[in-house]
Amino acid sequence: MLVCVSLLILIHSVPVSPVTVSSRNPKVEVHEFSDAELSCEFKTEKDTNPRIEWKRKDKEKDVSFVYYGERFVGPFQDRADIEGATVRLRRVTQADAGEYRCEVSAPSDSISLGETNVTLRVLVPPQTPSCDVPSSALTGSQVELRCRDRHSIPPAVYTWYKDNRALPIRHPNATYTVNEFTGVLIPQSHYNPGTVCQHCMYHPNYHIPNTQLTTTFQTHDLNVAAVVSAVVLVCVILFLCAFGVCLAHRQGYFSRHRGRSFWIPHCHGVTHISSQNLNPSEHTQHSGYSHPPKEPQDFKHTQSFML
């Protein structure tokens, strides 16, 4: 009996070393189109040939296999190698970014499963930024100068230049507002930024080369003399038009016809009959000539002229 108890105590006193999995670099950051090493190290208690699997969780939280059944699957078949449990990916892109998990399964161990996570971040250098800058503006008007790059990772940091001198982000007497993270420059209404503005981007923490774009922005003062001349010219034109209308009215070009007129439709057009044709007697009174009376019932020839 004492022997059994001693054996049990001895078994429980022996330290058990279950499978352990770890990574030398749990957060990996590499430039786009370079190689990435996903470190995975393990120790087992008894099993000398454990099963190794790699899985990946993308930005949409979808889980897929990277290494399964002692071979790479999916898009990693021809551009990945494994040594022990460490995976090396060649020419990584933004599509490869995400969270990777290394799983080691040792059925012979008391604790048969161990895992560790490795996060891969692919850095994208800044490209030539898109520019939203008006070519010119009137002095005193409110404008916004924008510079942005939507593809750089991490997000770009922007610096604006005036006459090849960087504009300070924070200045007590600044006549502008600059947001280094959004790339927006808002000059104040009385600020003249000059004729040339240069803006660039940089990543000071990741040693990515600067990318810059130069553009031209000009301010023009309002031409008061031209505005006054235009107003005077419009007033002169309106005065001449009014004077011409009054003169034409005095000359009778706008007087109405006093006689009445009637329009009678014809077969092939319209016949116009005036009031003078309807009342010939009124017209002949002024001419001094009257027609002789006619007797429609007893018509006789009359002698019109005396010889």
From Swiss-Prot:
GO cellular component labels: bicellular tight junction; plasma membrane; protein complex involved in cell adhesion; tight junction
Residues exposed to the Extracellular side: 19-226
PROSITE patterns: IG_LIKE (PS50835)
Function: Junctional adhesion protein that mediates heterotypic cell-cell interactions to regulate different cellular processes. During myogenesis, it is involved in myocyte fusion through the binding of jam3b on neighboring myocytes.
Keyword Ribosomal protein tagged: no
Record domain Ig-like C2-type: where: 126-225
TM regions (residue ranges): 227-247
Biological classification of the source: Eukaryota, Metazoa, Chordata, Craniata, Vertebrata
Cystines in this chain: C40-C102, C147-C197
Primary residence: membrane
SMART domains the record matches: IG (SM00409), IGc2 (SM00408), IGv (SM00406)
Effect of loss of the gene: Morpholino knockdown impairs myocyte fusion during myogenesis.
Biased composition (Polar residues): 278-288
Superkingdom of origin organism: Eukaryota
Protein name: Junctional adhesion molecule 2A
Keywords: Cell junction, Cell membrane, Disulfide bond, Immunoglobulin domain, Membrane, Repeat, Signal, Tight junction, Transmembrane, Transmembrane helix
GO biological process: cell-cell adhesion
Domain annotation Ig-like V-type: ranges: 19-112
